[in-house]
Amino acid sequence: QTPQGEYASATLLRNQLRQGSFPARYLPPSAGPLYQNAPHCPADGLEQVVLWKLRTMTPAQLAAIAQVGEGLEHRILRAARKAASLEQLLALCGSKRYTNARLRRIFYCALLDISQEEQTGRPEYLRILGMGAKGREILSAMPQKGIPVTASPAKFQDLTQVRRDALAADLWGLGC
């Protein structure tokens, strides 16, 4: 979480914002007003629902979740029964091998029921979050075969990953 020169990790930026410190040095000037005026999501906004979900899962169900393997499901389920918070859960599950970042991904995959199977294939679509004139030029020159590329996933509601993205956004909104 230590900045590397001009760049800082997303985790560092989120933590600074949660602590009331504004990381202007690491953001483009145009982003400053957006971040300062936006509501901030608490770090623990979804922790109770994550703990509930894990406590209601069987070892087999958790073993089927993306990035879970080698008996990790047993470690997580034991810890979920003891933990009263997400921080406690991370402390009980974490190790050099199982980093907090990986564990958080697993917890949220469990919440969204994202299976190992779903994550082994290629992406169903590529979502463009932003682009300039050069990006639009490149996009228009791309062949329209293969994986769909879009800035508006609403066109692809029949794709599982688009529905998962929408569910994740809804859950995140509930946690804020």
State what each model feature region is.
Residues 1-176:
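Active-site cores that bind ATP or allylic diphosphates and position pyrophosphate for catalysis
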